[in-house]
């Protein structure tokens, strides 16, 4: 079922890790831990397990960027299978809220990314129709989704030779929220010209569906290129999915409206008895407007707040989520579990406190509280085998796995963990300056991690006065600004970057051979064992990698990190010796900046200049068009990481202007 495409075979610790994990899965163990260093091939190990077991798979990642990287890698490993991407479809999202202290109501504001929305629908469709499906998702996986049984009822199939009146076919499409548009065929619409009906699926822009009629009979079905209308493939039959994941039929709408009105009566009675007339009026107006829209159009603004009734759930019953679309035997991989598990645990409480105010003050019915993410205990109730993956797994994962950890320490590339040196804080700035001169002589880059914003700024000014090519990354920087600074570091525009929390999971800077950690002995979230190990691991892409701890004494976290580092180095050195491997720095392409624009026309220019002439605004429009073109090209080439990066730039341009 799954066919793994790769030019290499498992090596290093990979064969043993694959075997250990496979044996535990076969023994029906539900919790497994894979502890792997950076560069040990954890994604390739996941791919081998997927291919071995031929089970539908969910891979969870704690942010969109890393999820997109995993998606791209798995898509390369499994080009003949369905690899899907399920994350939040909002480019911008501000949830509905009410602040009683200032009597401020904040309406929901969002900007939907249609491409991500289509990919979410594609994920649901694939899970319900194909077993050879891999879905890469973020925390969005535990948020509400439509009841899979009800959603599947909205699928309908057509076949060549089927007797079907065109008007009945149109009605079937409209019931599933397709809109007729004979002028511009956009996703989720259809056009009818003579005996030919063309449908633009809501779940993909790769093709359109052409259905040709002869009288009241379907004569031909084909998928075509949506732009030039050339034939892609002929079909004997075709399964058509809804245009909206919250498709509702008349029976459901009638039931929902009845149940909502019953709850409304009870709630209005409650407000009246408690002399809350403003809340009473507010709620009645809101709910009646929603129900009028639902009865007329089958959908309304904020329909998710009535999810309990749409799904047919009882009060307090857990919501349907992406997890309910998985078959019972599915595999679940939790990447960077030390970050992902706490994220899963935190979602419910934050959502609940916000919505409780909306209910208490008459903006929503109490049933809106059931439009929520899963609680962590509900997530735990799913019996899929869960494989936790991290360089630094937490106590939760280890305890769940009965203390058994499958380790991957050896890198097939032969690269070692960087050497760690501990130095006194005395004269540390002068010492760092000397190190920077050595780095420049080798044409290698440096990162410095501080603990305060003030010290970062002072250190940056000091090195600038010394003539160093240095940049400072801080929390005020937008996504594109951080990425651009790091790109310029790799390119050599900067030799040094200073910051507080630079080395987050997933950062990849092969040109950096020196990482300096100031105040390494200050036990804190950024200086505990897990954080230090993560930092050291991120500096392991260069064959001459080195980490310097500046400290007055060796803290417990420092000692544990140094011991961990020494053990990993010895294992890798022995492996390299046995296999004749000479470690070499990873060669990785440096992404180009936005093409065709000098600084005057760059993104920084448009964001930093508040007063803009008409000429400058025209240049801004030209830049936006160029960005959109590059984003589309990156998406078509399945370079989703770059596409998402370009999308973020567009959003930030829009916010500033």
Curated annotation (Swiss-Prot):
Organism: Mycoplasmopsis pulmonis (strain UAB CTIP) (Mycoplasma pulmonis)
Family per similarity comment: Belongs to the UvrB family.
Stored SUPFAM superfamilies: C-terminal UvrC-binding domain of UvrB, P-loop containing nucleoside triphosphate hydrolases
Secretion signal, residue range per the UniProt entry: none
Main function: The UvrABC repair system catalyzes the recognition and processing of DNA lesions. A damage recognition complex composed of 2 UvrA and 2 UvrB subunits scans DNA for abnormalities. Upon binding of the UvrA(2)B(2) complex to a putative damaged site, the DNA wraps around one UvrB monomer. DNA wrap is dependent on ATP binding by UvrB and probably causes local melting of the DNA helix, facilitating insertion of UvrB beta-hairpin between the DNA strands. Then UvrB probes one DNA strand for the presence of a lesion.
Domains (record comment): The beta-hairpin motif is involved in DNA binding.
UniProt feature coiled coil, ranges: none
Keyword terms of this UniProt record: ATP-binding, Cytoplasm, DNA damage, DNA excision, DNA repair, Excision nuclease, Nucleotide-binding, SOS response
Binding residues annotated for ATP, in chain numbering: 36-43
Chief site of localization: cytoplasm
Domain Helicase ATP-binding, first and last residues per copy: 23-412
Domain of life: Bacteria
HAMAP family for this protein: UvrB (MF_00204)
Domain UVR, chain residue ranges per copy: 621-656
Motif, Beta-hairpin: chain positions: 89-112
Protein name, entry field: UvrABC system protein B
Taxonomic path: Bacteria, Bacillati, Mycoplasmatota, Mycoplasmoidales, Metamycoplasmataceae
BP-aspect Gene Ontology terms: nucleotide-excision repair; SOS response
């Amino acid at each position: 079922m799954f066919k793994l495409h790769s030019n290499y075979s498992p090596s290093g610790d990979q064969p043993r890790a694959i075997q250990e994990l496979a044996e535990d899965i076969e023994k029906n163990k539900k919790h497994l831990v894979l502890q792997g260093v950076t560069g040990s091939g954890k994604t390739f190990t996941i791919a081998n397990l997927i291919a071995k077991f031929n089970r539908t798979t969910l891979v969870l990642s704690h942010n969109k960027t890393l999820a997109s990287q995993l998606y791209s890698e798995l898509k390369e490993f499994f080009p003949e299978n369905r690899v899907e991407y399920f994350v939040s479809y909002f480019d911008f999202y501000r949830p509905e809220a009410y602040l009683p202290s200032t009597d401020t109501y904040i309406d929901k504001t969002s900007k939907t990314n249609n491409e991500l929305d289509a990919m979410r629908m594609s994920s649901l469709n694939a899970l319900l129709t194909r077993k050879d499906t891999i879905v890469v998702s973020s925390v969005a996986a535990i948020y509400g989704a439509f009841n899979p049984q009800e959603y599947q009822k909205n699928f309908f199939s057509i076949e060549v030779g089927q007797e079907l009146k065109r008007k009945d076919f149109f009605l079937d499409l409209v019931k599933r929220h397709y809109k007729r548009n004979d002028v511009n065929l956009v996703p989720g619409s259809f056009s009818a010209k003579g005996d030919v009906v063309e449908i633009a699926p809501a779940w993909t822009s790769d093709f359109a569906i052409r259905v040709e009629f002869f009288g009241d009979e379907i004569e031909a079905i084909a998928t075509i290129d949506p732009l030039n209308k050339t034939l892609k493939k002929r079909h004997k039959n075709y399964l058509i999915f809804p245009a909206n994941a919250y498709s509702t039929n008349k029976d459901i709408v009638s039931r929902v409206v009845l149940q909502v009105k019953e709850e409304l009566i009870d709630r209005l009675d409650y407000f009246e008895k408690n002399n809350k007339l403003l809340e009473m009026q507010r709620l009645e107006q809101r709910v009646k407007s929603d129900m009028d829209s639902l009865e007329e159009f089958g959908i309304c603004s904020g329909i998710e707040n009535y999810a309990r009734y749409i799904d047919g759930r009882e009060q307090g019953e857990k919501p349907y989520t992406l997890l309910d679309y998985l078959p019972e035997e599915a595999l679940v991989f939790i990447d960077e579990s030390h970050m992902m598990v706490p994220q899963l645990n935190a979602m419910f409480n934050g959502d609940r406190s916000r919505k409780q105010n909306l209910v208490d003050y008459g903006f929503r019915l109490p049933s809106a509280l059931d439009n929520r993410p899963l609680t962590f205990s509900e997530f735990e109730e799913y019996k899929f085998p869960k494989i936790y993956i991290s360089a630094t797994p937490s106590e939760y994962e280890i305890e769940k796995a009965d203390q058994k950890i499958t380790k991957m320490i050896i890198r097939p590339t032969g690269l070692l963990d960087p050497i760690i040196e501990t130095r006194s804080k005395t004269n540390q700035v002068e010492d760092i300056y000397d190190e920077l001169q050595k780095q420049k002589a080798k044409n290698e880059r440096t990162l410095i991690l501080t603990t305060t914003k003030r010290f970062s700024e002072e250190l940056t000014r000091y090195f600038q006065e010394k003539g160093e090519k240095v940049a400072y990354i801080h929390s005020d920087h937008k996504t594109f600004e951080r990425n651009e600074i790091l790109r310029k570091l790799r390119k050599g525009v900067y030799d040094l970057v200073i910051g507080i929390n630079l080395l987050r999971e997933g950062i990849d800077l092969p040109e950096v051979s020196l990482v300096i950690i100031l105040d390494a002995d200050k036990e804190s979230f950024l200086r505990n064992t897990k954080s230090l190990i993560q930092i050291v691991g991120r500096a392991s892409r260069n064959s001459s990698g080195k980490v310097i701890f500046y400290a007055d004494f060796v803290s417990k976290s420092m000692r544990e990190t140094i011991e961990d580092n020494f053990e990993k180095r010895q294992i890798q050195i022995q492996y390299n010796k046995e296999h004749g491997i000479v470690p070499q720095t990873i060669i990785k392409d440096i992404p180009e900046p936005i093409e065709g624009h000098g600084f005057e026309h760059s993104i920084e220019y448009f964001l930093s200049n508040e007063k803009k002439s008409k000429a400058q605004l025209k240049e801004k429009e030209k830049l936006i068009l160029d960005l959109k073109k590059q984003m589309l090209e990156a998406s078509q080439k399945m370079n989703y990481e770059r596409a998402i990066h370009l999308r973020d730039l567009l959003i930030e341009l829009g916010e500033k202007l």
